[in-house]
């Protein structure tokens, strides 16, 4: 697991106590996106890590994975593929259900987005429990692709997502981490 910690990235992320409920320390990356220098440092760190690594597709998970995955896709000249919540993609999809802290959710991917042999990089803003990214990995695998790496702006290691994804054989890049929930 690789960690890059430019201060500008970490310092641009706002922490909001007790949101969305008591006891949660919410890590708000919208303040990073509003800071051009921090956003550039974030994308540049991803570019440096993944340039010339042989990826054939970049997948961003809804919705902030789009914000970080699309510029990386552009910079590397690799197709960007969105993974969406149900009912948002217009063509035939493959679905994957996954568990949330209080219930279930589903992610979808166009059936023609990944072809057997694709080497896929997954991108999202934050890794907490790992449920969303695990569901995304399973979608890629259902279509015959190989998800080998996952990139996150923020990781919350105490919530177990890093261990969960590492057990699946995925290499993780986190730019910053925060303690607690």
From Swiss-Prot:
InterPro entries hit by this protein: Ade_phspho_trans, Adenine_PRTase, PRibTrfase_dom, PRTase-like
Biological process terms in GO annotation:
adenine salvage; AMP salvage; purine ribonucleoside salvage
Q: Which GO terms describe its cellular component?
A: cytosol
* EC code: 2.4.2.7
Q: Which reaction does it catalyse?
A: AMP + diphosphate = 5-phospho-alpha-D-ribose 1-diphosphate + adenine
Query: Please, which domain of life does this record's source organism belong to?
Result: Bacteria
**Pathway stated in the Swiss-Prot or TrEMBL entry:** Purine metabolism; AMP biosynthesis via salvage pathway; AMP from adenine: step 1/1
| Protein location | Cytoplasm
* Classification via PROSITE patterns: PUR_PYR_PR_TRANSFER
Cite the GO molecular-function annotations of the record: adenine phosphoribosyltransferase activity
Please provide the record's keywords in A-Z order.
Cytoplasm, Glycosyltransferase, Purine salvage, Transferase
Q: Which NCBIfam families match?
A: apt (TIGR01090), PRK02304.1-1 (NF002632), PRK02304.1-3 (NF002634), PRK02304.1-5 (NF002636)
What is its quaternary makeup?
Homodimer.
> Which family does the entry's similarity section mention?
Belongs to the purine/pyrimidine phosphoribosyltransferase family.
Biological function: Catalyzes a salvage reaction resulting in the formation of AMP, that is energically less costly than de novo synthesis.
This chain's protein is named Adenine phosphoribosyltransferase
Organism equals Pseudoalteromonas translucida (strain TAC 125)
Q: Which gene encodes it?
A: apt
